[in-house]
Amino acid sequence: MANAANMIKVEQIGSPIRRHHSQRATLVGLKLNKIGRVTELQDTPEVRGMIAKVQHLVRVVDEK
């Protein structure tokens, strides 16, 4: 696992109901499945791209 300096916390704030299947898959890739869940991920360009794809469903809680 990466050190704490390269981690980002993401919280799901929106429902994937009636969303495109690719947006649902992106939430699964971000390890999110219910509103209010928070996950800590490595801060990489790939993860940032996934967050940008579903920016209306998630928010960044903490950037270290």
From Swiss-Prot:
Assembly notes: Part of the 50S ribosomal subunit.
Annotated S-S bridges: none
CDD domains with a match to the protein in the record: Ribosomal_L30
Family named by the database record: Belongs to the universal ribosomal protein uL30 family.
Pfam families associated with the record: Ribosomal_L30 (PF00327)
Single GO BP term: translation
A GO MF label: structural constituent of ribosome
Keyword Ribonucleoprotein on entry: yes
Keywords assigned: Ribonucleoprotein, Ribosomal protein
Organism: Rhodopseudomonas palustris (strain HaA2)
Database matches in InterPro entries: Ribo_uL30_ferredoxin-like_sf, Ribosomal_uL30_bac-type, Ribosomal_uL30_ferredoxin-like
A single GO cellular-component term on record: cytosolic large ribosomal subunit
Entry protein name: Large ribosomal subunit protein uL30
